[in-house]
Amino acid sequence: MEVDLLHFEKKYHNYIVAGIDEAGRGPLAGPVVASAVIIDNTNIIPGIKDSKKLSKKKRELLYEQITSNYVWAAAIISHIEIDEINILEATKKACSIAAANLSLKPEIVLVDGNMPFKDKRFVSMINGDNLSLSIAAASIVAKVTRDRLMLDLSTEFPQYLWHKNSGYGTKEHIEAINMHGLSPYHRRSFKCC
């Protein structure tokens, strides 16, 4: 059965609805990125779905379309702050900042996951990137934004292969850590090797 990705946007049709998702909760290196997107219900971009279900090429194409046609914002929390406040709090902070940075003030904020927020506008949705078009669009913007950041960092530290693994704990990444030690961009609070 096909899921109506606009179900929640339609449910809250009298409100300005933003979707939020993050990228980078699980990697061993780099920041966590959250993105907020307010879609235009009169201009639905075809092909938007959870970023994990898209090829890199398709994500890049949709990223350009989303950021050109919809209201959006992103927030980046560094690996240093992740180590200071923990990944959950860093993710929540990134989500809150992304929502606050939107040029339109959202009245309802649909967030992928099950994180509790003090702000009553925030509605957490488990598997939200498969249930809401706004969240799916945000997942694409967050993923592409973070992947581009990690690609930039990989030019400084090519031995960790971040251009391929985006900082995640792949076999090759862990082998590189064991051989070269941690880079300045590795999260110290994440135990991996």
Swiss-Prot record:
A divalent metal cation binds at residues 21-22, 112. It is found in: Cytoplasm. Keywords: Cytoplasm, Endonuclease, Hydrolase, Manganese, Metal-binding, Nuclease. Its main location: cytoplasm. Its EC number is 3.1.26.4. One of its GO terms (molecular function) is manganese ion binding. InterPro entries: RNase_HII, RNase_HII/HIII, RNase_HII/HIII_dom, RNaseH-like_sf, RNaseH_sf. It holds the Pfam family RNase_HII. The keyword Transcription does not apply. It catalyses: Endonucleolytic cleavage to 5'-phosphomonoester. Manganese or magnesium. Binds 1 divalent metal ion per monomer in the absence of substrate. May bind a second metal ion after substrate binding. The keyword Membrane does not apply. GO terms for biological process: DNA replication, removal of RNA primer; mismatch repair. Residues 15-193 form the RNase H type-2 domain. It comes from the Bacteria. Its cofactor is Mn(2+); Mg(2+). One of its GO terms (cellular component) is cytoplasm. Belongs to the RNase HII family. Endonuclease that specifically degrades the RNA of RNA-DNA hybrids. This is Ribonuclease HII. It comes from Rickettsia felis (strain ATCC VR-1525 / URRWXCal2).
